[in-house]
Protein backbone atom coordinates (compact mmCIF):
# COMPACT_ATOMS: atom_id res chain seq x y z
CA UNK A 1 0.00 0.00 0.00
CA UNK A 2 1.16 3.53 -0.80
CA UNK A 3 1.16 5.03 2.68
CA UNK A 4 1.07 8.56 1.34
CA UNK A 5 -2.34 7.96 -0.26
CA UNK A 6 -5.52 6.71 1.40
CA UNK A 7 -8.05 5.49 -1.14
CA UNK A 8 -11.71 5.47 -0.16
CA UNK A 9 -13.32 2.07 0.33
CA UNK A 10 -17.04 1.29 0.38
CA UNK A 11 -17.98 -2.10 1.82
CA UNK A 12 -21.25 -3.86 2.42
CA UNK A 13 -22.64 -7.25 3.36
CA UNK A 14 -26.07 -8.80 3.46
CA UNK A 15 -25.73 -11.09 6.46
CA UNK A 16 -27.67 -14.40 6.12
CA UNK A 17 -29.69 -13.35 3.10
CA UNK A 18 -29.82 -14.23 -0.61
CA UNK A 19 -29.32 -17.60 -2.25
CA UNK A 20 -26.62 -18.10 -4.91
CA UNK A 21 -29.31 -17.61 -7.58
CA UNK A 22 -30.45 -14.37 -5.95
CA UNK A 23 -26.83 -13.29 -5.61
CA UNK A 24 -26.24 -13.71 -9.33
CA UNK A 25 -29.33 -11.65 -10.14
CA UNK A 26 -28.37 -8.93 -7.67
CA UNK A 27 -24.80 -8.70 -8.92
CA UNK A 28 -25.94 -8.54 -12.53
CA UNK A 29 -28.13 -5.55 -11.71
CA UNK A 30 -25.52 -3.96 -9.43
CA UNK A 31 -22.96 -3.92 -12.22
CA UNK A 32 -25.21 -1.54 -14.16
CA UNK A 33 -25.33 1.03 -11.33
CA UNK A 34 -21.94 0.57 -9.65
CA UNK A 35 -19.73 3.65 -9.29
CA UNK A 36 -17.57 4.37 -12.31
CA UNK A 37 -13.98 5.48 -12.20
CA UNK A 38 -11.29 4.44 -9.78
CA UNK A 39 -11.75 6.94 -6.95
CA UNK A 40 -12.73 4.19 -4.50
CA UNK A 41 -12.55 0.47 -3.83
CA UNK A 42 -15.82 -1.45 -3.51
CA UNK A 43 -16.12 -4.60 -1.41
CA UNK A 44 -19.17 -6.86 -1.22
CA UNK A 45 -19.00 -9.51 1.49
CA UNK A 46 -21.48 -12.34 1.07
CA UNK A 47 -22.49 -15.63 2.73
CA UNK A 48 -20.04 -18.44 2.02
CA UNK A 49 -22.33 -20.38 -0.33
CA UNK A 50 -22.80 -17.23 -2.43
CA UNK A 51 -19.10 -16.51 -2.94
CA UNK A 52 -18.67 -18.50 -6.20
CA UNK A 53 -21.73 -16.86 -7.77
CA UNK A 54 -20.56 -13.41 -6.68
CA UNK A 55 -17.03 -13.93 -7.97
CA UNK A 56 -18.28 -15.17 -11.34
CA UNK A 57 -20.73 -12.29 -11.68
CA UNK A 58 -18.10 -9.67 -10.82
CA UNK A 59 -15.31 -11.08 -12.94
CA UNK A 60 -13.67 -8.35 -15.03
CA UNK A 61 -14.94 -5.64 -12.69
CA UNK A 62 -13.00 -3.85 -9.96
CA UNK A 63 -15.42 -4.97 -7.22
CA UNK A 64 -13.77 -7.15 -4.60
CA UNK A 65 -15.77 -10.04 -3.18
CA UNK A 66 -15.37 -10.97 0.45
CA UNK A 67 -16.64 -13.34 3.12
CA UNK A 68 -18.49 -12.52 6.33
CA UNK A 69 -16.29 -14.64 8.60
CA UNK A 70 -13.55 -17.27 8.63
CA UNK A 71 -11.81 -19.68 10.98
CA UNK A 72 -8.36 -18.87 12.34
CA UNK A 73 -7.02 -22.36 11.63
CA UNK A 74 -5.51 -23.35 8.30
CA UNK A 75 -7.16 -26.80 8.27
CA UNK A 76 -8.32 -29.55 10.57
CA UNK A 77 -11.32 -31.07 12.30
CA UNK A 78 -13.46 -27.93 12.47
CA UNK A 79 -16.75 -29.08 10.98
CA UNK A 80 -18.69 -26.29 9.33
CA UNK A 81 -15.80 -23.81 9.39
CA UNK A 82 -13.98 -22.16 6.47
CA UNK A 83 -10.25 -21.38 6.37
CA UNK A 84 -8.58 -18.32 4.89
CA UNK A 85 -6.86 -20.30 2.12
CA UNK A 86 -10.25 -21.70 1.05
CA UNK A 87 -11.66 -18.18 0.74
CA UNK A 88 -8.62 -17.01 -1.20
CA UNK A 89 -8.91 -19.94 -3.61
CA UNK A 90 -12.62 -19.17 -4.05
CA UNK A 91 -11.73 -15.67 -5.23
CA UNK A 92 -12.21 -13.58 -2.09
CA UNK A 93 -10.21 -10.43 -1.42
CA UNK A 94 -11.74 -9.33 1.89
CA UNK A 95 -13.13 -10.93 5.04
CA UNK A 96 -15.22 -9.25 7.74
CA UNK A 97 -13.97 -10.05 11.24
CA UNK A 98 -15.41 -9.29 14.65
CA UNK A 99 -18.82 -8.13 13.49
CA UNK A 100 -21.02 -7.34 16.48
CA UNK A 101 -23.37 -10.18 15.53
CA UNK A 102 -20.43 -12.59 15.71
CA UNK A 103 -19.29 -11.10 19.01
CA UNK A 104 -22.83 -11.55 20.34
CA UNK A 105 -22.40 -15.28 19.67
CA UNK A 106 -19.30 -15.43 21.86
CA UNK A 107 -16.48 -14.31 19.57
CA UNK A 108 -13.81 -12.61 21.69
CA UNK A 109 -11.12 -10.03 21.00
CA UNK A 110 -8.60 -12.89 21.11
CA UNK A 111 -10.58 -14.79 18.47
CA UNK A 112 -10.61 -11.72 16.24
CA UNK A 113 -6.85 -11.29 16.64
CA UNK A 114 -6.18 -14.91 15.63
CA UNK A 115 -8.33 -14.45 12.54
CA UNK A 116 -6.62 -11.19 11.60
CA UNK A 117 -3.24 -12.91 11.66
CA UNK A 118 -4.58 -15.91 9.73
CA UNK A 119 -5.95 -13.68 6.97
CA UNK A 120 -2.79 -11.62 6.65
CA UNK A 121 -0.83 -14.85 6.32
CA UNK A 122 -3.25 -15.91 3.59
CA UNK A 123 -3.06 -12.66 1.59
CA UNK A 124 -6.60 -11.55 2.38
CA UNK A 125 -7.59 -8.10 3.64
CA UNK A 126 -9.32 -8.14 7.03
CA UNK A 127 -12.16 -5.71 7.67
CA UNK A 128 -11.93 -5.51 11.46
CA UNK A 129 -15.16 -4.43 13.15
CA UNK A 130 -15.19 -2.57 16.45
CA UNK A 131 -17.95 -0.74 18.28
CA UNK A 132 -19.69 -0.05 21.55
CA UNK A 133 -23.06 -0.91 23.04
CA UNK A 134 -25.53 1.74 24.11
CA UNK A 135 -24.60 1.05 27.73
CA UNK A 136 -20.94 1.83 27.03
CA UNK A 137 -21.85 5.02 25.18
CA UNK A 138 -24.11 6.14 28.02
CA UNK A 139 -21.23 5.53 30.45
CA UNK A 140 -19.08 7.91 28.43
CA UNK A 141 -16.33 5.34 27.81
CA UNK A 142 -16.83 4.76 24.09
CA UNK A 143 -13.35 5.81 22.97
CA UNK A 144 -11.58 3.74 25.61
CA UNK A 145 -13.72 0.68 24.86
CA UNK A 146 -13.28 0.85 21.10
CA UNK A 147 -9.55 1.56 21.30
CA UNK A 148 -9.13 -1.49 23.55
CA UNK A 149 -10.81 -3.58 20.84
CA UNK A 150 -8.44 -2.14 18.24
CA UNK A 151 -5.38 -2.82 20.37
CA UNK A 152 -6.48 -6.41 20.99
CA UNK A 153 -7.35 -7.10 17.35
CA UNK A 154 -3.91 -6.03 16.12
CA UNK A 155 -1.77 -7.67 18.82
CA UNK A 156 1.29 -9.22 17.21
CA UNK A 157 0.65 -7.54 13.83
CA UNK A 158 3.42 -5.38 12.34
CA UNK A 159 2.98 -2.06 10.57
CA UNK A 160 3.39 -3.48 7.06
CA UNK A 161 0.56 -5.97 7.61
CA UNK A 162 -1.60 -3.47 9.49
CA UNK A 163 -1.51 -1.17 6.48
CA UNK A 164 -3.37 -3.86 4.49
CA UNK A 165 -6.29 -3.88 6.94
CA UNK A 166 -9.52 -1.90 7.08
CA UNK A 167 -11.13 -0.94 10.39
CA UNK A 168 -14.92 -0.63 10.51
CA UNK A 169 -16.48 1.35 13.35
CA UNK A 170 -19.99 0.00 13.89
CA UNK A 171 -21.72 1.25 17.04
CA UNK A 172 -23.85 -1.70 18.13
CA UNK A 173 -26.74 0.54 19.06
CA UNK A 174 -26.95 1.75 15.45
CA UNK A 175 -26.94 -1.61 13.65
CA UNK A 176 -30.29 -2.49 12.13
CA UNK A 177 -32.11 -0.15 14.51
CA UNK A 178 -32.74 2.77 12.21
CA UNK A 179 -30.59 4.92 14.48
CA UNK A 180 -27.30 6.31 13.24
CA UNK A 181 -24.45 8.04 14.97
CA UNK A 182 -24.24 11.73 14.18
CA UNK A 183 -21.36 12.77 11.92
CA UNK A 184 -19.73 14.35 14.95
CA UNK A 185 -20.03 11.16 17.01
CA UNK A 186 -18.63 9.02 14.19
CA UNK A 187 -15.78 11.42 13.49
CA UNK A 188 -14.80 11.55 17.16
CA UNK A 189 -14.55 7.77 17.46
CA UNK A 190 -12.80 7.35 14.11
CA UNK A 191 -10.25 9.95 15.22
CA UNK A 192 -9.70 8.01 18.44
CA UNK A 193 -9.24 4.80 16.43
CA UNK A 194 -6.67 6.47 14.18
CA UNK A 195 -4.83 7.83 17.21
CA UNK A 196 -4.70 4.32 18.68
CA UNK A 197 -3.38 2.97 15.38
CA UNK A 198 -0.66 5.63 15.48
CA UNK A 199 0.38 4.44 18.93
CA UNK A 200 0.54 0.86 17.65
CA UNK A 201 2.09 1.35 14.22
CA UNK A 202 3.29 4.94 13.84
CA UNK A 203 1.68 8.00 12.33
CA UNK A 204 2.44 7.17 8.70
CA UNK A 205 0.76 3.77 8.84
CA UNK A 206 -2.16 5.11 10.86
CA UNK A 207 -2.84 7.81 8.28
CA UNK A 208 -2.72 5.25 5.47
CA UNK A 209 -5.17 2.83 7.08
CA UNK A 210 -8.81 3.08 6.05
CA UNK A 211 -11.56 3.45 8.64
CA UNK A 212 -15.22 2.89 7.78
CA UNK A 213 -18.44 3.74 9.56
CA UNK A 214 -21.25 1.19 9.52
CA UNK A 215 -24.67 1.14 11.12
CA UNK A 216 -28.08 1.69 9.49
CA UNK A 217 -26.52 3.27 6.41
CA UNK A 218 -28.75 4.07 3.44
CA UNK A 219 -28.71 6.31 0.34
CA UNK A 220 -30.31 9.11 2.34
CA UNK A 221 -27.63 9.39 5.01
CA UNK A 222 -24.46 8.14 3.33
CA UNK A 223 -23.16 11.65 2.66
Stretch-by-stretch model annotation:
Residues 1-223:
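Active-site loop-to-helix "anion-binding N-cap" substructures in soluble metabolic enzymes
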Amino acid sequence: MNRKYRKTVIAGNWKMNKTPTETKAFMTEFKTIMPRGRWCDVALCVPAVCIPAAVRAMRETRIGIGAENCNANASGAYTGEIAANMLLDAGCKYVILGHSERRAMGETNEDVNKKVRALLGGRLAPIVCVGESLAVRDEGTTNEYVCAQVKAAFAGVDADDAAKCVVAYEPIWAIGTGRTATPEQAEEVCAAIRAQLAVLFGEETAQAMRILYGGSMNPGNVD
